[in-house]
Design a protein with these regions (language model features):
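N-terminal export/targeting leaders of redox proteins
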Residues: 1-25, 107-108
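Sequence/structural segment immediately N-terminal to covalent heme-attachment motifs in c-type
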Residues: 25-47
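Sec-exported extracytoplasmic/periplasmic mature domains
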Residues: 36, 65, 75, 79, ...
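Gly/Gly-Pro-rich "capping" loops immediately C-terminal to redox-active cysteine motifs
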Residues: 42-78
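C-terminal capping alpha-helices of c-type cytochrome domains
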Residues: 87-108
């Protein structure tokens, strides 16, 4: 009986982890779409993970960014980068998703 309970617990934990991995993968794919198409980040930035070869903004392959830092930069802009949040270019949800994507793809 203890083995059955143990196996059920392990199965439950594995299912939860698989669901989280699938959710993260979906978020990464949506983030890539926002980066390349919706926001057009690829036009200015270099980032191998996105196939981006821009030449205006910083090379995102050479920096290790946190999700919060990316959110702030995308929302409020920095230098010549527009304020995608304040100017209504991206929704808060889109900013959250693209920030997750960049933070998990930059510096790699």
């Amino acid at each position: 009986m203890k083995i059955i309970k143990f196996l059920l617990i392990i199965s439950f934990v594995l299912i939860i982890n698989i669901q989280n991995l699938l959710a993260d993968e979906a978020k990464m794919l949506k983030g890539l779409e926002i980066f390349n198409e919706t926001a057009g980040c690829a036009g200015c930035h270099i980032m191998k993970a996105a196939g981006a070869e821009g030449n205006v903004g910083p090379n995102l392959d050479t920096v290790d960014l946190t999700e919060e830092l990316v959110k702030d930069m995308v929302t409020y802009g920095l230098g010549v980068m527009p304020a995608y949040g304040e100017e209504g270019i991206l929704t808060k949800e889109e900013i959250d998703i693209v920030s997750f994507y960049v933070a998990n793809s930059s510096g790699k």
